[in-house]
């Protein structure tokens, strides 16, 4: 009988070679996630730069949206496809453009290109954080936190227009274009009175407050026993001891508020929880808007305001303002619908 001594090694395959090359130590880590991230990010950014530089929105929105037409950084945009395109993916080789690149740009194909590559690019970036965290034995909280902006992007740019009649009703990729979309959301959905929007605002602004308080508190309680010229040179990045005094910080905030965090883990988890929860709530709210779910309606106030000219609240004024936004934007944004509003549905009262 023959006894083989040693460890059995499986035969290496092309997958092992690819894994070695993709995950080797280099200045910019590639990894398996990079196969998704880098091409998608390149195409999304390249498509946006191309669109804002050269491509008009005359055929989709009746607007000038490129630097070539006289726009600047704040007014240029890659606009959504025409309303008649519905939810078509608008491939260059598809039945709409039929391989004609110019026609594809005129129909709004660049928007679909940027939106889809952008979504997969963001997902690739989250996978990159998972992959690197696994490689260096970190927990995956960075990737989990980044799921929040991904949820917002996907809900606003993809799910909302999927619930409506077409990509036309998604935001265009531009600064002023996003502002107009926000006004649209307010006028047609009363978004500011939606509880999910309120939770989102509380999460984002609460996170900003927590960030400012945390940074100031750490700066306030830094140990000074270093020989460096300033705060940033006083400590070695590989030091074993603490940089700041948690005990002093706890004492300070206990005196200010009467309560304070005494545990660093809970403190930092709370700083993660607040913005991530807020953004996720916003994303859920936008999914609701895709289904045309309504915000709060205080009908009793509306009825009383309609019957009593001396009764008005900030709510009833905002409702009138929303009616004005709808009456103005619908005819402007959708001239092809030939919308005609009878007098009784046009804004009334003194809100405008």
Swiss-Prot record:
Q: Which GO terms describe its cellular component?
A: chloroplast thylakoid membrane; photosystem II
Q: Provide the gene name from the record.
A: psbD
Where along the chain is pheophytin a bound? Answer: 129, 142
Question: What is the name of the protein in this document?
Answer: Photosystem II D2 protein
Q: How is it modified after translation?
A: Phosphorylated in vitro.
Q: Where does Fe cation bind?
A: 214, 268
Miscellaneous comment as given in the Swiss-Prot or TrEMBL entry: 2 of the reaction center chlorophylls (ChlD1 and ChlD2) are entirely coordinated by water.
Q: Which residues carry this modification: N-acetylthreonine?
A: 2
What Pfam families does the entry give? Photo_RC
Q: Name one GO biological process term.
A: photosynthetic electron transport in photosystem II
Origin species: Chlamydomonas reinhardtii (Chlamydomonas smithii)
Which enzyme type, at the first EC level? Answer: oxidoreductase
Q: Which residues carry this modification: Phosphothreonine?
A: 2
The entry sums up its family as follows: Belongs to the reaction center PufL/M/PsbA/D family.
